[in-house]
Amino acid sequence: MAKIAVYGAGSWGTALAVSMGKAGHEVALVGRNLSEMDLMEQRRENRPYLPGVVLPPTVRPTGDAGVLEEAEMLVLSVPSHSVRETAQKIRAYLQPGTIVVNTAKGLEEGSHKRLSQVLTEELPHHPIVVLSGPSHAEEVGKDMPTTVVVASQNSQAAEAVQDMLMTPKFRVYTNPDTIGVELGGAFKNIIALCAGFADGLGFGDNTKAALMTRGIAEITRLGAAMGGNPLTFAGLAGVGDLIVTCTSRHSRNHRAGVALGEGKPLEQVLKEVGMVVEGVRTTRVAYELSRQYEISMPITEQAYQVLFQGADPRAAVSALMMRGKKHEIEEVALIAMEQGSYQENGPDDHGE
């Protein structure tokens, strides 16, 4: 059994620690607030973020980052905007060659870089693996069957992570397409916000199905333009994650979208949700990327207008419905062309 450290004691970090601990691994769950970690150790439960889930004896909550020195694998479970800063803080503790698994689903604001690119810059002596897929912490913590995907340019590292994470209730696939896996996990949060808008406005299943279907089409367009394999967006990190995030009561992005659709201001919504809503930041980045790559992303554009330009969600839905006539098969043809380009030339790994 392996020695594993999870840095970030929120709901997802705790759920992964519990899953790996039940598999027999020795897991250090590292948080920044010493008093909270001491309380978690006493209670054997993370009441603020994952109430009702008992920590197995193999999971040790701690505020001491020094335990990272012993880790064979580090699972980084912090918000996307904290990834670079966190990597800078902890890199002195890591042994050379320690595998680093990123679980955040977002992009770096300003640079537009994927988080594996950020980690490669800050931790150049460590294999970087990304984990994504339809996986709410509340369900993983309760041992409900869950399937995810890990991706890396280092196939041996990806397979090592697969072996360490796999349990009878937590199935892990591998995928060499790091770009597609990261972008699918990040961009689906935008569509989840929009699905929430629709629910908040009182619209029905037809509307949500349209948003999800057309949403995955525009995610795939931009993802392929950025070097991802279009097939990845039809898998766990794309359609799979999109479905669960757009339909689940556990989804922060969907809950935030519902509140916005009901007319609440963004600042109030973010305060009420209480945890990071990745889709808000990602909407701005995706909007800027769509303009950079000259890719049509009408749903993302309307989400941007609602979040950052004060547009009314109902008007945004009307704008989408009143767009010029299109032929759906053109979308399929474009994706097929991009897929052929990917297979012929391989992914643009941007130096990874």
Curated annotation (Swiss-Prot):
Key word Chloroplast present: no
Predominant localisation class: cytoplasm
Top-rank taxon, per record: Bacteria
Catalytic activity: sn-glycerol 3-phosphate + NAD(+) = dihydroxyacetone phosphate + NADH + H(+); sn-glycerol 3-phosphate + NADP(+) = dihydroxyacetone phosphate + NADPH + H(+)
Gene Ontology molecular function: glycerol-3-phosphate dehydrogenase [NAD(P)+] activity; NAD binding
Pfam families: NAD_Gly3P_dh_C, NAD_Gly3P_dh_N
InterPro entries recorded: 6-PGluconate_DH-like_C_sf (IPR008927), 6PGD_dom2 (IPR013328), G3P_DH_NAD-dep (IPR006168), G3P_DH_NAD-dep_C (IPR006109), G3P_DH_NAD-dep_N (IPR011128), NAD(P)-bd_dom_sf (IPR036291)
Binding, sn-glycerol 3-phosphate: 105, 133, 135, 188, 241, 251-253
Keywords assigned: Cytoplasm, Lipid biosynthesis, Lipid metabolism, NAD, NADP, Nucleotide-binding, Oxidoreductase, Phospholipid biosynthesis, Phospholipid metabolism
Single Gene Ontology BP annotation: carbohydrate metabolic process
Family: Belongs to the NAD-dependent glycerol-3-phosphate dehydrogenase family.
NCBIfam families assigned to the protein according to its UniProt record, in alphabetical order: PRK00094.1-2, PRK00094.1-3, PRK00094.1-4
Name of the protein in question: Glycerol-3-phosphate dehydrogenase [NAD(P)+]
Taxonomic path: Bacteria, Bacillati, Bacillota, Clostridia, Eubacteriales
